[in-house]
Amino acid sequence: MLFNEFCKIIEKIENTPKRLEKIDYFVEIIDFVKNHGKPENLKEICQVSIGRVFAEYENREIGIGPNLLIEAIKTTGISENDLNLKIKETGDIGISVEHLSSKIKQISLFNEPLTFEEVYSTIKKLSTIEGTSSQKKKIRIISNLLIIANPIESRYISRLILEDMRIGMNIPTILAAFSNYFGIEKEKIEKVYAVTNDIGLIGKKLLENSNFEEDPELNLTVFRPIKPMLAQLTPSIEEAVIEMKNPQFETKYDGARVQVHKSNGEVKIYSRRLEDITNSVPELVLEIKNLEVDNVILEGECVAMNLENGKPRPFQDILRRFRRKYDIDKMTEEVSLRIYFFDILYHNKGLIDLPLFERRNILENIFGTNNWDLELKKIENEIKSNKMLFTSFKVSSTDLKIAKEFFKWSLSIGHEGIMVKNLNAIYTPGSRVKTMCKIKQTLENLDVVVTRAKIGMGKRKDWYGSYEISVKGDDESLHVIGNVGSGLTEEDLEKLTKIANEIKIEDLGGEVILEPKIVLEVTYEEIQTSEKYEMGYALRFPRVVGIREDKSINDINSLDDVKKIYEIERKRK
C-alpha cells in the first residue's frame, strides 16, 4: 500500500469532526487494504491511526520528542527561523513541515513512492537505536525519510514520529468501523479488545477470516496484560450496600495497582499503565516463583510497608521502587514491598466471566483467607510480619455496623478507606463499573493531565512554576480545571521542566502548550462552580501530591468524576 494513499484517506478523517464520517472513512481504509494490501497492513494502520507504533501492552515508544524532530527537519534544508515561525503560526510541527516542504532538498526526482510498510518499519526502527551517536543516527533516518516524502506525507510522518496523529481517531471509533465492515456485533468486538488490548491484532485477524470468537490469540493470554477494571466513587457505605445488593467490603490500600502473570515458572509484573516493572521488584518475583500455582494472572495492590508498625509508607516510595533501574538490591533493603491480591483473572483459562465470589474462592485456595470478621488476630499479626503476599482483607456482610467498623479499622492501619464489590459481578477490563465502588474519608484526589506550563517567578524563574491542569470529557476532549504550582519541590520543578521542554508543542513566550503526557495527582480544598472555565468547575487551592509516572492520559479523572465529587461534597455540607 502506498503511503500517499493512506495519507489521503486519513486527511479526510482529520478534516471531519463527525464521528460517523470518521467511521465511514476508516471502513474505506479496511476495504482498500483487503483489496490491495495484506492483513499485517491493517494491524499497523490501526496502531498508526491512534498515534501508536506499538500495541499498548508492548510497553514501547519511539521516544522522540519535538526538539529532536526539529533538529532532523533542519537538516533537510528548512531553516530554523522559518520552521519556528511556522510552528508558532500553526501550532503543529506536521503541518509546518508540509507548508515548508518546497524548501526541502530532494535527493532525486526518480525516487520510488514511499510505501506504508517502508514508512512504518523505518519509524519503528528508531526505537531500537541506542548508545553513542544514537541521536545523530535518528536524525539521519528521519531526515532521509522527509527528503523522499511529498508534502502530505511529511505531515503524517512527522506526527507519527511524535506518536500524535491528530486525526481524531480512537479505539471505539475503529471498533465501530470493524463492526460495520465485518458485520459483527460491536459488543463482541469490544469484549475481544478488552481481553487482548491490541486493536491491530483484531484488525489483522478479521481480515484473515479467522473464526473470530474462537481464535485462541484473541483470548485472555498470560504475559499480555489487560487494562484494570475501575471503581465508581460512592458517598456513603449506606448507598454502597443498596447499590451492590450482595456486597463484599475490602480494604482500599494506599498503594499501586499491579497485575502479576506467571507461566512455566516465568513471572512478569505490570503496573496499571501496563509497564513491565519485573526487574524493579526482584523479591516479589522470587516469592511468586515459589508459589505452587502456575499459569495465572493475578491482580492486586502493591504497598510500600513500614514493617515496624505495619503501616504503609508514602506512595512515592512505591514509585521510587518501580522506576529504579540501578542499585535495585540497595533499594530493596530500603523500601519493603508487599502485594495484597484481590482478584484472579486467569488460571489455565480465563476467569473474568465468573462471578466475583467464585474468583475469590479460587484466589483464597492459593493464598489463604483474610476474613476480617473471623480472623482479625491472625491478620493483625501478619500485618507486622515479613510476609510479602496476601489476599486483601475483606468482610462479606449487609450489616452496616460491621461495614462501618471495617471502614474505621482500615483507616486505623493507615490505608485510604474501603472498596465495596458486588459478589455476583463479572470482571470487565478497562471499564469503570457500577458493580464496584470506593469509599474514602477524605476528598478524592484527582489525577489530571498538564496541558500548559508557565515560567515561574522569583526562586522559580529558571523552571516552569505553574501548570494548567485538565480532566477528560466523554469524547476524549480535555477540560481545564485550574492551575497548580504548590506542592512541588525544586527537584519536582526541575524534572517537570525537563519533560515539558521535550513535549512542548508551541512556545508562546513565557508559556508553552504541551502534549498531554504529564499526569499529576492533586488534592484541593473543594470543587467549586466557575465561569472561568468552559467545563463550569474549578479546583479551589489545588496542590500537587505527586507526579504519577505510573499513569497515562487514559487514567486521568473525567468531567463526570468532577461532577460526582462536587455533588457528594454538596450533600455532605
Curated annotation (Swiss-Prot):
Pfam family, one: DNA_ligase_A_C
Catalytic reactions of this protein: ATP + (deoxyribonucleotide)n-3'-hydroxyl + 5'-phospho-(deoxyribonucleotide)m = (deoxyribonucleotide)n+m + AMP + diphosphate
One GO BP annotation of this record: DNA recombination
Gene Ontology terms for molecular function: ATP binding; DNA binding; DNA ligase (ATP) activity; metal ion binding
EC number: 6.5.1.1
InterPro entries linked: ATP-dep_DNA_ligase, DNA_ligae_ATP-dep_bac/arc, DNA_ligase_ATP-dep, DNA_ligase_ATP-dep_C, DNA_ligase_ATP-dep_cent, DNA_ligase_ATP-dep_CS, DNA_ligase_ATP-dep_N, DNA_ligase_N_sf
Enzyme class: ligase
Chain sites annotated for binding ATP: 250, 257, 272, 301, 342, 432, 438
HAMAP family assigned: DNA_ligase
Assigned protein family: Belongs to the ATP-dependent DNA ligase family.
Protein name per UniProt: DNA ligase
Organism this protein belongs to: Methanococcus vannielii (strain ATCC 35089 / DSM 1224 / JCM 13029 / OCM 148 / SB)
Highest classification ranks of the organism: Archaea, Methanobacteriati, Methanobacteriota, Methanomada group, Methanococci
